[in-house]
A protein has these predicted regions:
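N-terminal leader segment of winged-helix/HTH proteins
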Residues: 1-40
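C-terminal regulatory/oligomerization modules of transcriptional regulators
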Residues: 1-11, 133-159
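Charged, amphipathic alpha-helical coiled-coil/dimerization segments
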Residues: 2-6, 81-141
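Base-recognition residues in the alpha-helical recognition helix of bacterial helix-turn-helix
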Residues: 19, 48-51, 77-79
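N-terminal helix-turn-helix DNA-binding core of bacterial DNA-binding proteins
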Residues: 26, 30-72, 86, 154-159
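Alpha-helical linker/hinge and terminal dimerization helices associated
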Residues: 28, 32-35, 69, 112, ...
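Residues within helix-turn-helix
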Residues: 62-63, 74, 81, 101
């Protein structure tokens, strides 16, 4: 039984919407994970790490990668070790800090990431194929309002 099915009709609409969003996210993410595994023999965390590095051609320090991916340093180290072994990323010493290094995509890693990213885009487009362009725009706009409100609430709480 998915999260949404557990909500009863007496629950507020906002709660039922939240559960629907979670369910949709879980279903789409599961599909993406399955496709990455079957087509590229990789995982979503590896794809995410490579995606972060693609956006930073000079590479990123491990702590910055960890922060951007919202995972522990140990997780980033484990994934990085695998990708280094496969020749998809490389470690580079950080000038002025003998204990730190940056990680960046190798040319081979960049080529593979571009292939995966194109497929990823296709999978996401397919996930929303049941909606018209207008519906996608409306949903994007509405979720933008939710995002802005949530962000503002969070900022108000941390002041």
């Amino acid at each position: 039984m998915d999260l949404e099915a557990r909500a009863h009709s007496e629950h507020p609409e906002a709660l039922r919407l939240w559960l629907r969003l979670l369910t949709c996210t879980q279903l789409i993410e599961k599909q993406v994970r399955n496709e990455l595994r079957s087509q590229f023999a990789t995982t979503l965390p590896r794809f995410d790490l490579m995606s972060q590095l693609e956006r930073s051609p000079d590479g990123l320090k491990m702590n910055e990668l960890s922060r951007r991916m919202m995972v522990t340093g140990g997780n980033v180290t484990g994934i990085t070790d695998q990708l280094v072994t496969e020749g998809l990323v490389e470690r580079i010493n950080v000038e002025g800090d003998r204990r730190a290094w940056r990680v960046r995509l190798t040319p081979r890693g960049r080529k593979l990431f571009h292939e995966m990213a194109q497929q990823h885009e296709d999978w996401i487009v397919e996930a929303f194929a049941g909606l018209s362009g207008k519906e996608i725009s409306q949903l994007h706009k509405l979720l933008g309002k939710v995002k802005e409100h949530s962000h503002n609430q969070l900022m108000a709480e941390t002041e």
